[in-house]
């Protein structure tokens, strides 16, 4: 059957027609992107998508939403849309829908993703296991964390708020970074470090620690400077970012009993070429008595262009697997 897959973020909403059957996503059509600010509601964007397609839309929707999906009224920063889950079927004139958190969608996507879209970062270069737990984390605007449980030919996605656990420094410089950030945030969660804005937090902390004058840069400019090696302090911040990402990826794998780890998120794709040469692996495996265990865990990175759309469709297919 056909469904409409939708990935809704703060500034953009992406639409695609997907075909699902027997719990699988058979195909995902061409993506259409709308700016949310140019459409007063999801309903109007839905109608615009139908007009662009030039035919009636399927009466089923799979929606990935960049925020919590529990509650009677859902809102996002930088997005004028308001979602009321109880009235979605009526507003969109559909029969069924699935509404999930955007990072939950990424976890669903991993369950359906071809291995060619998973780049090897470290550990054994082998396919993701067909049984067991896969830890999934993704730095973006924040830090998304989920885990994927595969068992007896089925899978289950468990969404978490793991991005909000405490940042744990592992050397003296990180002690100083934490102390500096506590002056601003009081409580420093790991997403204050491992996220798009996190690089700026590290950068400013390092400048203060070293007594180096610096100019406040927007995130895009800072990431560009760090990745292109145009600023020593930005490079140092990126090195610290990768160290911390490795540490928390390992911690989460231990906590979740994972047999493999997958990194997603917009930032993950940016640092794909940098990670293998960074201190990521050293921090990932350095877990004391469990170092040998950690060295046997494969770590992959998602390169699929739109995991949110694929994951939304996959979530629908998983829920309505009996529908042909």
Curated annotation (Swiss-Prot):
Name under which the protein is recorded: Glucokinase
SUPFAM superfamilies per the UniProt record, alphabetical: Actin-like ATPase domain
Enzymatic reactions: D-glucose + ATP = D-glucose 6-phosphate + ADP + H(+)
GO molecular function term, any single one: glucokinase activity
Pfam families: Glucokinase
Listed InterPro entries: ATPase_NBD, Bacterial_glucokinase, Glucokinase
E.C. code: 2.7.1.2
Family, as annotated: Belongs to the bacterial glucokinase family.
NCBIfam families for this protein: glk, PRK12408.1
Main location: cytoplasm
GO BP: glycolytic process
Binding site for ATP: 6-11
Keywords, in A-Z order: ATP-binding, Cytoplasm, Glycolysis, Kinase, Nucleotide-binding, Transferase
Compartments (UniProt record): Cytoplasm
Recorded GO CC terms: cytosol
CDD domains per the UniProt record, alphabetical: ASKHA_NBD_GLK
